[in-house]
């Protein structure tokens, strides 16, 4: 009887290891997806969107006349079906976000791993962009990263709508270096969100001295239709040997059909007002084998080619 039990246990161990290896291989071959909760501008919305399935959020940042980040505010017009006027003081939002992304905090949301700051620099003159970057860095360092002492752990994407505002990137980096925390740039990525020609976007990054950590967005309000031609161009750049893009995301996607189209195109992120819709599609048999929700272990700056 004993040899039989040993044989059974041995077979079970082999099968378990094989199953684990199979799971790991399936996970490794599936594209990690960032489900980006759109227009999360009030602290209470952080939990709301994460609980619906978002593993990342997008937050609007408005600036005052002196290039100080002021509010997490979008304003009218915004997406159809949304309240455009919710907001917080920027630094208050950062503190709430820090609580949600700091392990051990009572408000901690483990699934929230990336934050896109949609920087509303349209109110600024071009010559204020560098200063805006410096002031943004100081605010994040103090109120989100807690001056480098057990601050929030989420990765950050600085999304800039105007290619001419590329000096914001240098100002941000220079300020973190001046304040003694250049290592925090490891947690920071970049995006130009103005739907510009991909070639022009690449030129802006060259001017900014940036290689790597690049997300490329494409999209339009959910009130209007938009094709995937530019998404396809961004994905082609990402997958090419000499491309500069690491990740591609599409906004604002609220329909299952559009979600499927975006996934089929090979995007890495989908920005949405309804994270549960994206989650539902990812759980469909045809997509569950190809995609998975990204976790904190995923490096959002690493390219996953189609």
UniProtKB/Swiss-Prot annotation:
Disulphides: 78-84, 80-223
Binding residue positions for Mg(2+): 58, 60, 118
Entry's EC annotation: 4.6.1.-
Cofactor notes: Binds 1 Mg(2+) ion per subunit.
Active-site residues, as the UniProt record annotates them: 38, 74 (nucleophile)
InterPro entries, alphabetized: PLC-like_Pdiesterase_TIM-brl (IPR017946)
Tissue distribution of the protein: Expressed by the venom gland.
Catalytic activity, as annotated: an N-(acyl)-sphingosylphosphocholine = an N-(acyl)-sphingosyl-1,3-cyclic phosphate + choline; an N-(acyl)-sphingosylphosphoethanolamine = an N-(acyl)-sphingosyl-1,3-cyclic phosphate + ethanolamine; a 1-acyl-sn-glycero-3-phosphocholine = a 1-acyl-sn-glycero-2,3-cyclic phosphate + choline; a 1-acyl-sn-glycero-3-phosphoethanolamine = a 1-acyl-sn-glycero-2,3-cyclic phosphate + ethanolamine
Activity control mechanisms: Catalytic activity and hemolysis are inhibited by divalent ion chelators (1,10-phenanthroline, EDTA, and EGTA).
Pfam families, per database record: GDPD_2
SUPFAM superfamilies the UniProt entry points to: PLC-like phosphodiesterases
Similarity-based family: Belongs to the arthropod phospholipase D family. Class II subfamily. Class IIa sub-subfamily.
Name of the protein: Dermonecrotic toxin LiSicTox-alphaIA1a
Source organism of the structure: Loxosceles intermedia (Brown spider)
Lineage: Eukaryota, Metazoa, Ecdysozoa, Arthropoda, Chelicerata
